[in-house]
Amino acid sequence: MCGIFGVISDSINKADLKQLVNHSKQRGVDSSGLIYLKSGIYHVDRADYNVEKLLHVVSPYNSSVVCGHSRLITNGLGDNQPVVRESIAVIHNGIIVNEDVVWSNLKKQRHFVIDSEVIVAIAEEVLENGGEIVDIPERVLSLCKGVISCAMIFPEMGKLLLFSNNGSLYIGNKGLDFYFASERFGLDLIKCDNIGQLKNEDFKLLEIPGNRQSFAIKDYKIRSEDLIPEFKFISSEEKLLEHRSPKIKRCTNCVLPETMPFIRFDDKGVCNYCKNYRLRNVPKPKEELFKLVEGYRRPGKELDCIVPFSGGRDSCFGLHLIVKELKMKPVTYTYDWGMVTDLGRRNISRMCSQLGVENIIVAADISLKRRNIRMNLEAWLKSPHLGMMAMLTAGDKHFFRHVETIKKQTGISLNLWGVNPLEVTHFKTGFLGIEPDFEEKRVYSNGAMKQFRYHSKRFIAMTESLGYFNRSLWDTLSGEYYRSFTEKQDYYHLFDYWRWDEDLVNDVLLGEYVWEKAIDTPTTWRIGDGTAAFYNYVYYTVAGFSEHDTFRSNQIREGQITREQALILLEEENRPRYPNIRWYLDTLGLDYEKVIKVVNSIPKLYKE
Protein backbone atom coordinates (compact mmCIF):
# COMPACT_ATOMS: atom_id res chain seq x y z
CA MET A 1 0.00 0.00 0.00
CA CYS A 2 1.68 3.16 -1.16
CA GLY A 3 1.45 6.34 -3.13
CA ILE A 4 2.81 5.97 -6.64
CA PHE A 5 3.70 8.77 -9.04
CA GLY A 6 5.56 9.46 -12.25
CA VAL A 7 6.46 11.94 -14.95
CA ILE A 8 7.57 11.66 -18.57
CA SER A 9 9.08 14.88 -19.87
CA ASP A 10 11.89 16.17 -22.06
CA SER A 11 12.67 18.62 -19.25
CA ILE A 12 11.38 17.66 -15.81
CA ASN A 13 9.88 20.46 -13.76
CA LYS A 14 11.71 20.13 -10.44
CA ALA A 15 9.01 21.90 -8.43
CA ASP A 16 6.23 19.72 -9.86
CA LEU A 17 8.11 16.50 -9.15
CA LYS A 18 8.81 17.60 -5.59
CA GLN A 19 5.12 18.40 -5.15
CA LEU A 20 4.08 14.96 -6.38
CA VAL A 21 6.63 13.31 -4.12
CA ASN A 22 5.57 15.32 -1.11
CA HIS A 23 1.89 14.43 -1.54
CA SER A 24 2.66 10.73 -1.99
CA LYS A 25 4.05 10.67 1.56
CA GLN A 26 0.49 10.95 2.85
CA ARG A 27 0.04 7.26 2.04
CA GLY A 28 3.10 6.04 3.96
CA VAL A 29 6.72 6.88 4.75
CA ASP A 30 8.15 3.51 5.78
CA SER A 31 10.14 3.02 2.58
CA SER A 32 10.53 4.49 -0.88
CA GLY A 33 11.79 3.82 -4.36
CA LEU A 34 12.56 5.56 -7.63
CA ILE A 35 13.12 4.37 -11.18
CA TYR A 36 14.64 6.86 -13.59
CA LEU A 37 16.62 7.09 -16.82
CA LYS A 38 20.22 8.26 -16.46
CA SER A 39 22.92 8.10 -19.12
CA GLY A 40 20.80 5.73 -21.19
CA ILE A 41 20.30 3.22 -18.34
CA TYR A 42 17.25 2.75 -16.13
CA HIS A 43 18.27 3.05 -12.49
CA VAL A 44 16.30 1.61 -9.58
CA ASP A 45 17.06 3.19 -6.20
CA ARG A 46 15.25 1.85 -3.13
CA ALA A 47 15.46 3.01 0.48
CA ASP A 48 14.05 2.13 3.89
CA TYR A 49 13.44 5.79 4.63
CA ASN A 50 11.09 8.48 3.32
CA VAL A 51 10.86 9.38 -0.34
CA GLU A 52 11.78 13.06 0.04
CA LYS A 53 15.14 12.05 1.45
CA LEU A 54 15.66 9.56 -1.37
CA LEU A 55 14.76 12.20 -3.96
CA HIS A 56 17.37 14.51 -2.43
CA VAL A 57 20.00 11.76 -2.54
CA VAL A 58 19.25 10.72 -6.13
CA SER A 59 18.28 14.10 -7.69
CA PRO A 60 16.92 12.59 -10.95
CA TYR A 61 15.96 15.97 -12.39
CA ASN A 62 17.89 15.54 -15.64
CA SER A 63 16.02 12.34 -16.50
CA SER A 64 13.20 12.17 -19.03
CA VAL A 65 11.41 9.42 -17.05
CA VAL A 66 10.95 9.32 -13.28
CA CYS A 67 8.55 6.99 -11.46
CA GLY A 68 8.40 6.25 -7.77
CA HIS A 69 6.51 5.38 -4.64
CA SER A 70 6.22 6.22 -0.96
CA ARG A 71 5.28 3.04 0.86
CA LEU A 72 3.30 1.91 3.86
CA ILE A 73 4.91 -1.47 4.47
CA THR A 74 2.43 -4.35 4.64
CA ASN A 75 4.66 -7.32 3.88
CA GLY A 76 8.14 -8.08 2.65
CA LEU A 77 10.11 -5.80 4.99
CA GLY A 78 13.39 -6.82 3.38
CA ASP A 79 11.95 -6.33 -0.10
CA ASN A 80 11.14 -2.96 -1.57
CA GLN A 81 9.75 -1.42 -4.71
CA PRO A 82 10.21 -1.04 -7.59
CA VAL A 83 10.16 -4.84 -7.83
CA VAL A 84 12.48 -6.02 -10.61
CA ARG A 85 12.59 -9.37 -12.39
CA GLU A 86 14.92 -9.63 -15.38
CA SER A 87 13.86 -6.83 -17.76
CA ILE A 88 10.57 -5.70 -16.16
CA ALA A 89 9.93 -3.52 -13.12
CA VAL A 90 6.69 -2.70 -11.29
CA ILE A 91 5.55 -0.13 -8.76
CA HIS A 92 2.38 -1.39 -7.11
CA ASN A 93 -0.13 0.28 -4.81
CA GLY A 94 -2.40 -2.26 -3.13
CA ILE A 95 -2.35 -5.71 -1.58
CA ILE A 96 -2.77 -8.97 -3.49
CA VAL A 97 -4.59 -11.28 -1.10
CA ASN A 98 -4.23 -14.53 -3.06
CA GLU A 99 -0.64 -14.36 -4.28
CA ASP A 100 0.17 -17.88 -3.03
CA VAL A 101 -2.65 -19.30 -5.15
CA VAL A 102 -1.51 -17.30 -8.18
CA TRP A 103 2.10 -18.46 -7.80
CA SER A 104 0.91 -22.08 -7.71
CA ASN A 105 -0.63 -21.57 -11.15
CA LEU A 106 2.48 -20.01 -12.70
CA LYS A 107 5.57 -21.70 -14.06
CA LYS A 108 7.77 -18.92 -12.75
CA GLN A 109 9.84 -19.24 -9.58
CA ARG A 110 9.18 -16.83 -6.73
CA HIS A 111 12.18 -14.83 -5.49
CA PHE A 112 10.76 -12.42 -2.90
CA VAL A 113 8.26 -12.22 -0.04
CA ILE A 114 6.57 -9.08 -1.35
CA ASP A 115 3.21 -9.78 -2.98
CA SER A 116 3.83 -7.36 -5.88
CA GLU A 117 6.38 -9.67 -7.50
CA VAL A 118 3.63 -11.89 -8.89
CA ILE A 119 2.48 -9.05 -11.18
CA VAL A 120 5.84 -9.10 -12.97
CA ALA A 121 5.83 -12.90 -13.16
CA ILE A 122 2.40 -12.86 -14.82
CA ALA A 123 3.63 -10.25 -17.31
CA GLU A 124 6.64 -12.41 -18.13
CA GLU A 125 4.44 -15.41 -18.87
CA VAL A 126 2.08 -13.37 -21.04
CA LEU A 127 4.96 -12.11 -23.19
CA GLU A 128 6.73 -15.50 -23.32
CA ASN A 129 3.49 -17.11 -24.52
CA GLY A 130 3.26 -14.72 -27.46
CA GLY A 131 0.98 -12.13 -25.89
CA GLU A 132 1.30 -8.36 -26.13
CA ILE A 133 1.80 -5.77 -23.42
CA VAL A 134 -1.84 -4.72 -23.86
CA ASP A 135 -2.87 -8.24 -22.79
CA ILE A 136 -1.17 -7.93 -19.40
CA PRO A 137 -3.77 -5.87 -17.46
CA GLU A 138 -6.61 -8.28 -18.19
CA ARG A 139 -4.47 -11.29 -17.26
CA VAL A 140 -3.19 -9.76 -14.02
CA LEU A 141 -6.62 -8.58 -12.90
CA SER A 142 -8.25 -11.90 -13.74
CA LEU A 143 -5.77 -13.89 -11.66
CA CYS A 144 -5.12 -11.57 -8.72
CA LYS A 145 -7.58 -10.64 -6.00
CA GLY A 146 -7.14 -7.44 -4.05
CA VAL A 147 -6.29 -3.88 -4.99
CA ILE A 148 -3.90 -3.45 -7.90
CA SER A 149 -2.92 0.00 -9.13
CA CYS A 150 0.45 -0.14 -10.78
CA ALA A 151 3.03 1.21 -13.17
CA MET A 152 5.03 -1.35 -15.16
CA ILE A 153 8.24 -0.40 -16.95
CA PHE A 154 9.50 -2.37 -19.97
CA PRO A 155 12.86 -0.78 -20.94
CA GLU A 156 13.64 -3.27 -23.72
CA MET A 157 10.32 -2.42 -25.41
CA GLY A 158 10.38 1.25 -24.49
CA LYS A 159 6.96 1.08 -22.80
CA LEU A 160 5.28 2.23 -19.59
CA LEU A 161 1.99 0.50 -18.68
CA LEU A 162 -0.51 1.90 -16.16
CA PHE A 163 -3.62 0.08 -14.93
CA SER A 164 -5.86 -0.27 -11.87
CA ASN A 165 -8.84 -2.32 -10.70
CA ASN A 166 -10.18 0.15 -8.11
CA GLY A 167 -9.42 3.57 -9.58
CA SER A 168 -6.55 4.59 -7.28
CA LEU A 169 -4.62 5.82 -10.31
CA TYR A 170 -4.95 9.15 -12.13
CA ILE A 171 -3.27 10.57 -15.22
CA GLY A 172 -2.92 14.09 -16.59
CA ASN A 173 -0.70 16.34 -18.64
CA LYS A 174 0.88 19.78 -18.70
CA GLY A 175 1.53 20.56 -22.31
CA LEU A 176 3.54 17.64 -23.66
CA ASP A 177 4.53 16.43 -20.19
CA PHE A 178 2.71 13.37 -18.82
CA TYR A 179 2.04 12.74 -15.12
CA PHE A 180 0.40 10.04 -13.01
CA ALA A 181 -0.40 9.70 -9.30
CA SER A 182 -2.41 7.56 -6.89
CA GLU A 183 -4.80 10.41 -6.15
CA ARG A 184 -6.33 13.15 -8.25
CA PHE A 185 -5.31 15.75 -5.67
CA GLY A 186 -1.64 15.17 -6.46
CA LEU A 187 -2.25 16.17 -10.08
CA ASP A 188 -4.51 19.05 -9.05
CA LEU A 189 -1.66 20.42 -6.93
CA ILE A 190 0.60 20.79 -9.96
CA LYS A 191 -2.27 22.07 -12.12
CA CYS A 192 -2.45 19.23 -14.63
CA ASP A 193 -4.94 19.33 -17.49
CA ASN A 194 -7.15 16.51 -18.81
CA ILE A 195 -7.06 14.58 -15.54
CA GLY A 196 -8.60 11.14 -15.86
CA GLN A 197 -9.04 8.05 -13.71
CA LEU A 198 -7.85 4.61 -14.80
CA LYS A 199 -9.99 1.65 -13.74
CA ASN A 200 -10.54 -1.91 -14.97
CA GLU A 201 -10.54 -1.98 -18.79
CA ASP A 202 -9.15 1.56 -18.98
CA PHE A 203 -5.37 1.37 -19.05
CA LYS A 204 -2.62 3.58 -20.45
CA LEU A 205 0.34 2.44 -22.56
CA LEU A 206 3.04 5.05 -23.14
CA GLU A 207 6.25 5.33 -25.13
CA ILE A 208 9.44 5.84 -23.13
CA PRO A 209 13.09 5.73 -24.22
CA GLY A 210 14.14 2.12 -24.83
CA ASN A 211 17.20 0.39 -23.43
CA ARG A 212 18.42 -3.21 -23.57
CA GLN A 213 20.81 -2.98 -20.62
CA SER A 214 19.98 -4.39 -17.21
CA PHE A 215 18.54 -2.22 -14.48
CA ALA A 216 21.15 -0.55 -12.28
CA ILE A 217 19.85 -1.34 -8.79
CA LYS A 218 20.92 0.29 -5.53
CA ASP A 219 19.42 -0.24 -2.08
CA TYR A 220 19.84 2.12 0.86
CA LYS A 221 19.25 0.43 4.24
CA ILE A 222 19.62 2.22 7.56
CA ARG A 223 16.64 1.00 9.63
CA SER A 224 17.22 -1.23 12.64
CA GLU A 225 13.57 -1.37 13.76
CA ASP A 226 11.49 -4.34 12.58
CA LEU A 227 8.17 -2.89 11.42
CA ILE A 228 6.77 -6.32 10.55
CA PRO A 229 7.93 -8.76 13.24
CA GLU A 230 7.63 -12.39 12.24
CA PHE A 231 5.25 -14.38 14.41
CA LYS A 232 6.79 -17.38 16.13
CA PHE A 233 4.59 -19.60 18.25
CA ILE A 234 6.17 -20.30 21.63
CA SER A 235 4.13 -22.69 23.76
CA SER A 236 5.52 -21.45 27.08
CA GLU A 237 4.46 -17.90 26.20
CA GLU A 238 0.94 -18.94 25.32
CA LYS A 239 0.65 -20.78 28.64
CA LEU A 240 1.36 -17.54 30.50
CA LEU A 241 -2.02 -16.23 29.39
CA GLU A 242 -4.66 -16.85 32.04
CA HIS A 243 -8.22 -17.78 31.22
CA ARG A 244 -10.41 -18.23 34.23
CA SER A 245 -14.16 -18.36 34.40
CA PRO A 246 -14.70 -16.46 37.64
CA LYS A 247 -17.90 -17.06 39.56
CA ILE A 248 -19.15 -13.49 39.44
CA LYS A 249 -22.66 -12.31 40.11
CA ARG A 250 -24.22 -11.25 36.83
CA CYS A 251 -27.38 -9.45 35.85
CA THR A 252 -30.26 -11.88 35.44
CA ASN A 253 -31.37 -10.11 32.26
CA CYS A 254 -28.08 -9.33 30.49
CA VAL A 255 -24.59 -10.67 31.28
CA LEU A 256 -22.96 -7.66 32.95
CA PRO A 257 -21.07 -8.68 36.11
CA GLU A 258 -20.89 -7.06 39.52
CA THR A 259 -17.43 -5.70 38.62
CA MET A 260 -18.95 -3.36 36.03
CA PRO A 261 -18.44 0.24 37.22
CA PHE A 262 -21.52 1.84 38.83
CA ILE A 263 -23.63 -1.29 38.46
CA ARG A 264 -26.52 -1.93 40.82
CA PHE A 265 -29.02 -4.81 40.95
CA ASP A 266 -32.66 -4.71 42.00
CA ASP A 267 -34.33 -7.39 44.10
CA LYS A 268 -34.84 -9.50 40.97
CA GLY A 269 -31.17 -9.28 40.03
CA VAL A 270 -31.72 -6.93 37.06
CA CYS A 271 -29.02 -4.29 36.65
CA ASN A 272 -29.49 -0.54 36.32
CA TYR A 273 -27.94 -0.65 32.82
CA CYS A 274 -30.85 -2.79 31.66
CA LYS A 275 -33.48 -0.74 33.48
CA ASN A 276 -32.22 2.52 31.96
CA TYR A 277 -31.56 1.12 28.48
CA ARG A 278 -33.17 2.77 25.49
CA LEU A 279 -33.32 0.85 22.24
CA ARG A 280 -30.58 1.99 19.86
CA ASN A 281 -31.05 -0.33 16.92
CA VAL A 282 -34.35 1.18 15.80
CA PRO A 283 -33.61 2.77 12.43
CA LYS A 284 -35.52 5.57 10.78
CA PRO A 285 -37.10 4.83 7.39
CA LYS A 286 -34.45 4.20 4.71
CA GLU A 287 -36.33 6.59 2.44
CA GLU A 288 -35.19 9.47 4.64
CA LEU A 289 -31.54 8.67 3.94
CA PHE A 290 -32.21 8.40 0.20
CA LYS A 291 -33.71 11.90 0.34
CA LEU A 292 -30.80 13.24 2.38
CA VAL A 293 -28.15 12.01 -0.08
CA GLU A 294 -30.05 13.01 -3.22
CA GLY A 295 -28.61 16.51 -3.23
CA TYR A 296 -25.07 15.14 -3.02
CA ARG A 297 -25.26 12.84 -6.05
CA ARG A 298 -23.03 13.77 -8.98
CA PRO A 299 -23.37 12.95 -12.66
CA GLY A 300 -21.51 10.26 -14.59
CA LYS A 301 -18.51 8.67 -12.91
CA GLU A 302 -17.88 11.62 -10.60
CA LEU A 303 -17.37 10.49 -7.00
CA ASP A 304 -19.98 11.79 -4.58
CA CYS A 305 -19.30 10.62 -1.01
CA ILE A 306 -16.48 9.79 1.40
CA VAL A 307 -16.62 6.60 3.46
CA PRO A 308 -14.37 6.50 6.54
CA PHE A 309 -13.06 2.97 6.23
CA SER A 310 -11.21 1.05 8.94
CA GLY A 311 -11.54 -2.35 7.30
CA GLY A 312 -13.59 -3.62 10.24
CA ARG A 313 -16.83 -5.47 9.69
CA ASP A 314 -19.13 -2.48 10.17
CA SER A 315 -17.33 -0.11 7.80
CA CYS A 316 -17.05 -2.95 5.26
CA PHE A 317 -20.75 -3.74 5.45
CA GLY A 318 -21.47 -0.03 5.31
CA LEU A 319 -19.50 0.25 2.07
CA HIS A 320 -21.51 -2.64 0.67
CA LEU A 321 -24.75 -0.79 1.47
CA ILE A 322 -23.51 2.48 0.00
CA VAL A 323 -22.55 0.89 -3.33
CA LYS A 324 -25.26 -1.77 -3.66
CA GLU A 325 -28.26 -0.13 -1.99
CA LEU A 326 -27.72 3.64 -2.06
CA LYS A 327 -26.04 3.38 -5.49
CA MET A 328 -23.55 6.07 -4.51
CA LYS A 329 -20.04 6.42 -5.99
CA PRO A 330 -17.82 6.54 -2.92
CA VAL A 331 -14.16 7.01 -2.23
CA THR A 332 -13.00 5.28 0.94
CA TYR A 333 -10.63 6.88 3.40
CA THR A 334 -8.40 4.85 5.73
CA TYR A 335 -6.26 6.20 8.56
CA ASP A 336 -3.45 3.76 9.24
CA TRP A 337 -1.83 4.55 12.59
CA GLY A 338 0.38 1.50 12.86
CA MET A 339 -2.04 -0.73 14.76
CA VAL A 340 -4.10 -1.88 11.79
CA THR A 341 -3.25 -5.55 11.35
CA ASP A 342 -2.34 -7.14 8.03
CA LEU A 343 -5.66 -8.95 8.17
CA GLY A 344 -7.47 -5.61 8.38
CA ARG A 345 -5.50 -4.25 5.45
CA ARG A 346 -6.22 -7.34 3.37
CA ASN A 347 -9.95 -7.01 4.01
CA ILE A 348 -9.74 -3.37 2.92
CA SER A 349 -8.09 -4.59 -0.27
CA ARG A 350 -10.75 -7.26 -0.83
CA MET A 351 -13.65 -4.85 -0.46
CA CYS A 352 -12.21 -2.01 -2.53
CA SER A 353 -11.11 -4.23 -5.39
CA GLN A 354 -14.35 -6.19 -5.60
CA LEU A 355 -16.52 -3.06 -5.43
CA GLY A 356 -14.15 -1.03 -7.63
CA VAL A 357 -13.80 1.71 -5.02
CA GLU A 358 -10.85 4.05 -4.69
CA ASN A 359 -9.10 3.95 -1.31
CA ILE A 360 -7.30 7.06 -0.07
CA ILE A 361 -4.86 6.28 2.71
CA VAL A 362 -3.55 8.69 5.29
CA ALA A 363 -0.72 6.90 7.06
CA ALA A 364 0.85 8.13 10.24
CA ASP A 365 4.55 7.81 10.92
CA ILE A 366 4.25 4.24 12.16
CA SER A 367 7.55 4.25 14.05
CA LEU A 368 6.54 7.43 15.86
CA LYS A 369 3.04 6.20 16.72
CA ARG A 370 4.35 2.90 18.04
CA ARG A 371 6.93 4.73 20.12
CA ASN A 372 4.11 6.78 21.65
CA ILE A 373 2.10 3.66 22.50
CA ARG A 374 5.19 2.01 23.96
CA MET A 375 5.89 4.97 26.26
CA ASN A 376 2.29 5.01 27.50
CA LEU A 377 2.17 1.25 28.02
CA GLU A 378 5.45 1.39 29.95
CA ALA A 379 3.93 4.13 32.13
CA TRP A 380 0.78 2.03 32.60
CA LEU A 381 2.78 -1.05 33.62
CA LYS A 382 4.39 0.93 36.46
CA SER A 383 0.96 1.76 37.90
CA PRO A 384 -1.76 -0.37 36.26
CA HIS A 385 -5.13 1.38 36.17
CA LEU A 386 -8.08 0.09 34.15
CA GLY A 387 -9.31 3.64 33.61
CA MET A 388 -6.08 4.47 31.79
CA MET A 389 -6.26 1.72 29.17
CA ALA A 390 -7.73 4.22 26.69
CA MET A 391 -4.34 5.98 26.58
CA LEU A 392 -3.09 3.04 24.51
CA THR A 393 -5.58 3.74 21.70
CA ALA A 394 -5.59 7.54 21.80
CA GLY A 395 -3.36 7.75 18.73
CA ASP A 396 -6.09 6.57 16.36
CA LYS A 397 -8.38 9.55 17.07
CA HIS A 398 -6.68 11.56 14.30
CA PHE A 399 -8.91 9.43 12.07
CA PHE A 400 -11.56 12.10 12.64
CA ARG A 401 -9.25 15.01 11.82
CA HIS A 402 -8.25 13.63 8.46
CA VAL A 403 -11.84 13.25 7.29
CA GLU A 404 -11.69 17.02 6.86
CA THR A 405 -8.37 16.67 5.03
CA ILE A 406 -9.93 14.29 2.51
CA LYS A 407 -12.99 16.51 2.08
CA LYS A 408 -10.74 19.40 1.10
CA GLN A 409 -8.60 17.29 -1.22
CA THR A 410 -11.49 15.68 -3.07
CA GLY A 411 -14.03 18.49 -2.98
CA ILE A 412 -16.57 15.97 -1.64
CA SER A 413 -18.52 17.05 1.43
CA LEU A 414 -20.79 14.08 2.21
CA ASN A 415 -19.34 11.47 4.55
CA LEU A 416 -21.24 8.30 5.43
CA TRP A 417 -20.23 6.29 8.49
CA GLY A 418 -20.83 2.64 9.33
CA VAL A 419 -20.75 2.82 13.14
CA ASN A 420 -22.34 -0.04 15.07
CA PRO A 421 -24.95 1.49 17.43
CA LEU A 422 -24.39 -1.30 19.96
CA GLU A 423 -20.68 -0.61 20.51
CA VAL A 424 -21.14 1.42 23.68
CA THR A 425 -18.62 0.68 26.43
CA HIS A 426 -19.43 2.74 29.52
CA PHE A 427 -16.87 0.84 31.56
CA LYS A 428 -13.82 2.35 29.86
CA THR A 429 -14.57 5.75 31.39
CA GLY A 430 -16.37 4.14 34.32
CA PHE A 431 -13.07 2.80 35.62
CA LEU A 432 -11.94 6.44 35.78
CA GLY A 433 -14.87 7.23 38.04
CA ILE A 434 -17.22 8.69 35.44
CA GLU A 435 -20.76 7.43 35.79
CA PRO A 436 -22.72 6.38 32.66
CA ASP A 437 -25.00 8.81 30.91
CA PHE A 438 -27.98 6.64 30.14
CA GLU A 439 -29.47 9.34 27.97
CA GLU A 440 -26.53 9.28 25.54
CA LYS A 441 -27.66 8.46 21.99
CA ARG A 442 -24.32 8.51 20.17
CA VAL A 443 -21.20 6.42 20.40
CA TYR A 444 -19.15 9.60 20.80
CA SER A 445 -20.37 12.58 22.78
CA ASN A 446 -18.95 16.08 22.28
CA GLY A 447 -20.39 17.58 25.45
CA ALA A 448 -17.79 20.03 26.71
CA MET A 449 -18.50 19.43 30.40
CA LYS A 450 -18.35 15.69 30.00
CA GLN A 451 -14.98 16.01 28.30
CA PHE A 452 -13.71 18.36 31.02
CA ARG A 453 -14.65 15.84 33.72
CA TYR A 454 -13.02 13.04 31.78
CA HIS A 455 -9.74 14.91 31.29
CA SER A 456 -9.67 16.08 34.91
CA LYS A 457 -10.03 12.56 36.25
CA ARG A 458 -7.55 11.20 33.75
CA PHE A 459 -5.00 13.86 34.71
CA ILE A 460 -5.26 12.77 38.34
CA ALA A 461 -4.70 9.16 37.29
CA MET A 462 -1.72 10.19 35.16
CA THR A 463 0.02 11.65 38.21
CA GLU A 464 0.22 8.12 39.62
CA SER A 465 2.75 7.30 36.89
CA LEU A 466 4.67 10.32 35.62
CA GLY A 467 5.76 8.40 32.54
CA TYR A 468 2.48 9.46 30.92
CA PHE A 469 3.86 12.99 30.66
CA ASN A 470 5.90 12.23 27.57
CA ARG A 471 6.27 13.30 23.94
CA SER A 472 3.04 11.57 22.95
CA LEU A 473 0.83 13.88 25.01
CA TRP A 474 0.22 16.44 22.26
CA ASP A 475 -0.65 13.69 19.78
CA THR A 476 -3.15 12.28 22.29
CA LEU A 477 -4.79 15.58 23.19
CA SER A 478 -5.01 16.91 19.64
CA GLY A 479 -6.57 13.68 18.38
CA GLU A 480 -9.18 13.75 21.13
CA TYR A 481 -9.91 17.40 20.38
CA TYR A 482 -10.75 16.62 16.76
CA ARG A 483 -12.88 13.66 17.80
CA SER A 484 -14.86 15.43 20.49
CA PHE A 485 -15.01 19.15 19.82
CA THR A 486 -14.89 19.85 16.10
CA GLU A 487 -18.20 20.41 14.36
CA LYS A 488 -19.20 17.63 12.00
CA GLN A 489 -20.98 18.62 8.80
CA ASP A 490 -22.55 16.60 5.96
CA TYR A 491 -22.17 13.64 8.27
CA TYR A 492 -24.62 10.73 8.47
CA HIS A 493 -24.66 7.31 10.15
CA LEU A 494 -25.89 4.48 7.94
CA PHE A 495 -27.21 2.50 10.87
CA ASP A 496 -29.50 5.33 11.83
CA TYR A 497 -31.44 4.14 8.76
CA TRP A 498 -30.49 0.45 8.44
CA ARG A 499 -31.01 -2.06 11.20
CA TRP A 500 -27.71 -3.54 12.31
CA ASP A 501 -27.96 -7.34 12.15
CA GLU A 502 -24.84 -9.34 13.03
CA ASP A 503 -25.91 -12.46 11.14
CA LEU A 504 -26.64 -10.46 7.98
CA VAL A 505 -23.35 -8.55 8.27
CA ASN A 506 -21.36 -11.77 8.61
CA ASP A 507 -23.29 -13.57 5.85
CA VAL A 508 -22.66 -10.75 3.37
CA LEU A 509 -18.98 -10.24 4.20
CA LEU A 510 -18.04 -13.91 4.42
CA GLY A 511 -20.27 -15.02 1.56
CA GLU A 512 -20.08 -12.27 -1.05
CA TYR A 513 -16.62 -10.88 -0.35
CA VAL A 514 -14.81 -13.96 1.07
CA TRP A 515 -13.84 -11.80 4.02
CA GLU A 516 -10.87 -13.09 5.99
CA LYS A 517 -11.28 -14.08 9.65
CA ALA A 518 -8.65 -14.19 12.37
CA ILE A 519 -7.02 -17.49 13.29
CA ASP A 520 -7.28 -16.90 17.05
CA THR A 521 -10.96 -16.04 17.62
CA PRO A 522 -14.34 -17.04 16.14
CA THR A 523 -15.73 -13.50 16.19
CA THR A 524 -15.53 -11.06 13.28
CA TRP A 525 -15.42 -8.05 15.59
CA ARG A 526 -12.21 -6.10 16.23
CA ILE A 527 -10.10 -8.59 14.27
CA GLY A 528 -8.36 -5.90 12.22
CA ASP A 529 -7.48 -3.89 15.33
CA GLY A 530 -4.05 -4.78 16.69
CA THR A 531 -4.78 -3.31 20.13
CA ALA A 532 -8.06 -5.06 20.98
CA ALA A 533 -6.76 -8.48 22.01
CA PHE A 534 -4.38 -6.97 24.55
CA TYR A 535 -6.72 -4.51 26.20
CA ASN A 536 -9.56 -7.06 26.33
CA TYR A 537 -7.16 -9.52 27.98
CA VAL A 538 -6.37 -6.90 30.63
CA TYR A 539 -10.04 -6.12 31.30
CA TYR A 540 -11.06 -9.77 31.46
CA THR A 541 -8.12 -10.84 33.63
CA VAL A 542 -8.61 -8.05 36.17
CA ALA A 543 -12.36 -7.40 36.07
CA GLY A 544 -13.76 -10.67 34.73
CA PHE A 545 -15.36 -9.12 31.64
CA SER A 546 -14.42 -7.34 28.43
CA GLU A 547 -16.06 -5.22 25.76
CA HIS A 548 -17.50 -8.47 24.37
CA ASP A 549 -19.68 -8.70 27.50
CA THR A 550 -21.02 -5.17 27.08
CA PHE A 551 -21.68 -5.73 23.37
CA ARG A 552 -23.51 -9.03 23.94
CA SER A 553 -25.51 -7.41 26.74
CA ASN A 554 -26.69 -4.72 24.34
CA GLN A 555 -27.71 -7.41 21.86
CA ILE A 556 -29.75 -9.13 24.58
CA ARG A 557 -31.55 -5.88 25.38
CA GLU A 558 -32.26 -5.36 21.69
CA GLY A 559 -33.77 -8.84 21.42
CA GLN A 560 -31.13 -10.06 18.96
CA ILE A 561 -29.81 -12.92 21.09
CA THR A 562 -30.76 -14.65 24.33
CA ARG A 563 -28.81 -14.48 27.56
CA GLU A 564 -27.95 -18.17 27.22
CA GLN A 565 -26.57 -17.61 23.71
CA ALA A 566 -24.49 -14.69 24.96
CA LEU A 567 -22.88 -16.76 27.72
CA ILE A 568 -21.91 -19.47 25.23
CA LEU A 569 -20.43 -16.91 22.82
CA LEU A 570 -18.50 -15.16 25.59
CA GLU A 571 -16.84 -18.36 26.70
CA GLU A 572 -15.02 -18.38 23.34
CA GLU A 573 -14.73 -14.64 22.69
CA ASN A 574 -13.04 -13.93 26.02
CA ARG A 575 -10.33 -16.51 25.49
CA PRO A 576 -6.87 -14.90 25.22
CA ARG A 577 -5.75 -14.28 21.65
CA TYR A 578 -2.09 -15.23 21.85
CA PRO A 579 -1.07 -14.48 18.21
CA ASN A 580 -2.62 -11.01 18.30
CA ILE A 581 -1.26 -10.16 21.76
CA ARG A 582 2.19 -11.36 20.75
CA TRP A 583 2.04 -9.28 17.53
CA TYR A 584 1.02 -6.20 19.50
CA LEU A 585 3.86 -6.43 22.02
CA ASP A 586 6.41 -7.34 19.34
CA THR A 587 5.52 -4.30 17.23
CA LEU A 588 5.99 -2.13 20.31
CA GLY A 589 9.34 -3.72 21.08
CA LEU A 590 8.26 -4.86 24.56
CA ASP A 591 9.15 -8.05 26.39
CA TYR A 592 6.11 -10.32 26.14
CA GLU A 593 6.80 -12.31 29.30
CA LYS A 594 7.41 -9.25 31.49
CA VAL A 595 4.26 -7.48 30.29
CA ILE A 596 1.96 -10.48 30.73
CA LYS A 597 3.34 -11.23 34.20
CA VAL A 598 2.57 -7.66 35.28
CA VAL A 599 -0.99 -7.96 33.95
CA ASN A 600 -1.49 -11.31 35.66
CA SER A 601 -0.27 -9.90 39.00
CA ILE A 602 -2.79 -7.04 39.13
CA PRO A 603 -5.24 -7.55 42.03
CA LYS A 604 -8.56 -8.86 40.76
CA LEU A 605 -11.81 -6.98 41.22
CA TYR A 606 -13.57 -10.24 42.06
CA LYS A 607 -12.99 -12.97 44.62
CA GLU A 608 -10.92 -15.81 43.20
Per-segment meaning from a language model:
Residues 4, 152, 162, 307, ...:
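Structural beta-sheet core signal
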Residues 316-327:
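Histidine-anchored nucleotide/phosphate-binding helix
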Residues 77-80, 137, 319-321, 402-405:
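Catalytic micro-motifs at enzyme active sites that drive phosphoryl/nucleotidyl and oxygen chemistry
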Residues 1-229:
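Conserved short alpha-helical segments that host acidic/polar catalytic motifs at enzyme active sites
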Residues 92, 309, 334-336:
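Short beta-strand/turn micro-motifs composed of small residues
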Residues 201-205, 210, 220-305, 325-608:
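Nucleotide-activated chemistry modules centered on ATP-dependent adenylation/adenylyltransferase
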Residues 95-96, 311-316, 421-423:
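Gly/Ser/Thr-rich loops at beta-strand to alpha-helix junctions
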